[in-house]
């Protein structure tokens, strides 16, 4: 299976929604503590085990997250440690990039998510405790959502409703927002420890998953959020990212500081259906391809990016 | 939370992801029963020792014991009280761990270096039977002394076990000993047989006629055809180790096991002056010491130990006995300390016992590597170091995050598996100890002991994070401090009682071989051994070494210094009217404070055309200091001082040392502690100068 060795530590990996063989990877020097960052755009060679880098962009600070535009196949957006948000167009020559840079967040930007239904806007979340809404055609952010009391590690659009999103924070709450409303519409105290990630179910717009420092992944139904639908135990350390499958209703992928990537079916009793131990350092980035069923990607502090088919060994080539 | 810098904020944020996770460890819900311990008269909260009265009638509570065995001194392993001798200990190991790796070497028979190849406990056992039988074959009798005159390698331990199994007395000789010392030891102990290597064989042959007791020389690592043949009539046989093995195998004898009270070994210590002294240790002495230590620090069959400290030293010897008890695999270094790091990388030991000199080198190597690693890496290291240090000081479990980020790479330098570091033989500076604890993330413990006590007198307890002391008494002995009025050390001293460290218990040696007079000097009628070290009791019953009773001290590299002798040499210098030589175990060189002769100084300055306003100014002139030191050096060479006995820097003072300024005794001897305090600033300045002119090596 394809493996890419980056010069820096991996932080995030995302499949292109337009090309099944294209990925973007966010990386940072010195574990993202101090130093530069780099964004890699990778191409999987069809039918061969190789990965080639088509382009890369250097940044002055760590890149913590990256996402692809849903409207332009060559555009991607990066969340940078210095509080900036940068937009790149891979169709343009490198000197023209980044095509935009927004310096609004006061602290590290930890996540970026493109609106999949309206396809004209995106969200960023930051350690300055805010979430910001941006439109591609505006020179500054459209709106700032400031309610969380600590770092917001992730903000994700609802897959069906173009105005609804969820945010996961170190203040131990998950919040649901509607951009038409003045404040959050729902506050779920989902974990007793910091919440590091969240994602919406792609088949049921009321179901969410959260992951936390408490080593668990929890699945929630916003219609009855007093108790979780499921609590998934199995990681040995904080769970850094959680992601719902775009193809199977009850399948969840997660990655953790315990260096493993896990696959869960939250509907069945023995929920842990797969565990991958291919990373040798913290596993912090994961994605599942929308275009190819079962194709997964992960990255971590071991500077490696793996792409593999579910059920196979990521290390087997 | 506010942080000084973004990188600190990032580190803290990620660290909190890892460290604040709920723990799966249920043991935290178990608490010690506080009532039980406070109800006992022996125990105090947070104490490592218990205090008992020395004599019931006088009622003075001044004897300290380990709280781990307050009512009875340990003399046998608590789990295996049937082990009374080194032979029993090895038999126990062979029965329990027969198939386990025991002795490993990476030196191949052709002298090249490769991977470690191992001998199991079972194989070592049959080899030691053959060696013992071979010695009997050559007429060595039970109770005879057998010398070991070569550096650490598997055969050393096999021979030592053979001695234990057949009741020979092993007499180790440092491979660095010169011909005169070897000659003395061989004759003094009346050695019948001696094991050597080709290099040390040549030394032996150079004075063969002067060591008539020797009947058998066994050459380890030498081929028979290359061995010299001796003229008939010398009565000495030279055989190779291999030949002795095969001779033994063809005439195997049953063991003749020793009794616990039998002599196991005679260890010759160099001493400060005069001839070596033979420390007589019984099997019971050694077993007691190791059994006591094992109560606090256990070795396991999964452990790998690196052997590089001389086996002739009691510290390494005791560790080996402990290793056998635990079924440890012992890998030997290739024989070159400068390649030790390479051996570490291949062996990947879990236990590392060493001396401050090597730890200081590791410290210097890492700090200078960090300094030259660039701003970013240096900054990361500093943040990680300080955070982990704070966690340890505050009694919290330090974050695994710092290890992952910074320290695991450093740990890899020692193979990555070290879980226990021991330090002994001279004091480890607290800075270096903290540094080792932080960088290697393992238990780092300092011990204190001497050959006369079969090794450990006291050692740091597990989980004691205070550095700068040598811990609580070995459960196999009791310790008291005796007033030394002439040096102003008493049990009434505030804040902590002070005095000469005295030790009693089953670990105390039988005496110096054939030297009752010296034995009586150190061992009193009540069985107390007077160490000559001055200690104080820190809170919690932990011992701290602060001085030597005699005016003798050790330098960092372990050399003993008798300052009066050196002062007498230097006062012959024309500029010097009085001289105070200072040195301590944290520095490897001596410095001098010299009270100058004003007349000589004036005349000399006039002849050199040096202008000055007052004598003090002249004393501070670097040209003057240089000239005086050069003349002192000349006198030192004339008097044949050894290299480390030379003062490496000098401070000149215009005023004399007198009774009035408190620097002299009524008999006109220098009051050393007072002089040290009086000139503290000048002394530290001189060491700074020495350090500045000798940059530390940048590589390990």
Swiss-Prot record, chain A:
Give the domain note.
Answer: The WD40 repeats are involved in the binding of PTS2-containing proteins.
**A biological process term (GO) from this entry:** protein import into peroxisome matrix
Q: In which tissues is it expressed?
A: Expressed in siliques and leaves, but barely detectable in flowers, stems and roots.
Which species?
Arabidopsis thaliana (Mouse-ear cress)
WD-type repeats, residues: 58-98, 104-144, 147-187, 190-230, 234-274, 278-317
Q: Which GO terms describe its cellular component?
A: Cul4-RING E3 ubiquitin ligase complex; cytosol; peroxisomal matrix
Q: What does this chain do?
A: Receptor required for the peroxisomal import of proteins containing a C-terminal PTS2-type peroxisomal targeting signal. Specifically binds to cargo proteins containing a PTS2 peroxisomal targeting signal in the cytosol. Cargo protein-binding triggers interaction with PEX5 and formation of a ternary complex composed of PEX5 and PEX7 along with PTS2-containing cargo proteins, which is tranlocated into peroxisomes by passing through the PEX13-PEX14 docking complex.
Q: What else is known?
A: The binding of a cargo to PEX7 is necessary but not sufficient for the targeting of the complex to the peroxisome. PEX12, PEX13 and PEX14 play a critical role in this targeting. PEX7 is required for PEX5 stability in light-grown seedlings.
Coiled coil regions, renumbered to chain: none
Give the family this protein belongs to, as stated in its UniProt record. Answer: Belongs to the WD repeat peroxin-7 family.
Q: Mention one GO molecular function.
A: peroxisome matrix targeting signal-2 binding
Q: Where in the cell is it found?
A: Cytoplasm, Cytosol; Peroxisome matrix
Chain's gene name: PEX7
Result of knocking out the encoding gene = No visible phenotype, but reduced sensitivity to indole-3-butyric acid (IBA) and inefficient peroxisomal import of PTS2-containing proteins.
- Subunit: Interacts with PEX5; interaction only takes place when PEX7 is associated with cargo proteins. Interacts with PEX13 (via N-terminus) and PEX12 (via C-terminus), but not with PEX14.
Q: What is this protein called?
A: Peroxisome biogenesis protein 7
From Swiss-Prot, chain B:
Q: Which Gene3D superfamilies match?
A: N-terminal domain of ligase-like
Q: Which cofactor does it need?
A: Mg(2+)
Would you kindly state one Gene Ontology biological process term found in this protein's UniProt entry? fatty acid metabolic process
Any single Pfam family the record assigns to this protein: AMP-binding
Q: Does the keyword Chaperone apply?
A: no
Q: What class of enzyme is it?
A: ligase
Instruction: Supply one GO molecular-function term.
Output: long-chain fatty acid-CoA ligase activity
**Chain segments carrying region Disordered:** 1-29
Q: What induces it?
A: Up-regulated by ozone and salt stress.
Kindly state which keywords UniProt assigns to this record, in alphabetical order.
ATP-binding, Fatty acid metabolism, Ligase, Lipid metabolism, Magnesium, Nucleotide-binding, Peroxisome
Task: Motif Microbody targeting signal — list its residue ranges.
Answer: 10-18, 698-700
Q: Does the keyword Coiled coil apply?
A: no
Question: Where are the stretches annotated Fatty acid-binding?
Answer: 526-550
Composition-biased stretches, type Polar residues, lie in 19-29
Localization, per the record, is:
Peroxisome
* Tissue-specificity statement: Expressed in roots, stems, leaves flowers and germinating seedling. Preferentially expressed in seeds.
Q: Which InterPro entries match?
A: AMP-binding_CS, AMP-dep_synth/lig_dom, ANL_N_sf, LC-FACS_euk
Enzyme Commission code(s) on record: 6.2.1.3
Where composition is biased (Basic and acidic residues), the residues are 7-18
The record's statement on gene disruption is: Seedlings of the lacs6 and lacs7 double mutant were arrested in postgerminative growth due to inability to mobilize fatty acids for beta-oxidation, a necessary process to pursue the development.
As for family, the record states:
Belongs to the ATP-dependent AMP-binding enzyme family.
Q: What function is annotated for this protein?
A: Activation of long-chain fatty acids for both synthesis of cellular lipids, and degradation via beta-oxidation. Preferentially uses palmitate, palmitoleate, oleate, linoleate and eicosenoate as substrates. Can use myristate and linolenate as substrates. Functions redundantly with LACS6 in lipid mobilization for beta-oxidation during seed germination, which is essential for postgerminative growth and seedling establishment.
Record note on quaternary structure: Interacts with PEX5.
Q: What is this protein called?
A: Long chain acyl-CoA synthetase 7, peroxisomal
Query: Which source organism?
Result: Arabidopsis thaliana (Mouse-ear cress)
Origin organism lineage: Eukaryota, Viridiplantae, Streptophyta, Embryophyta, Tracheophyta
**Gene expressing this chain:** LACS7
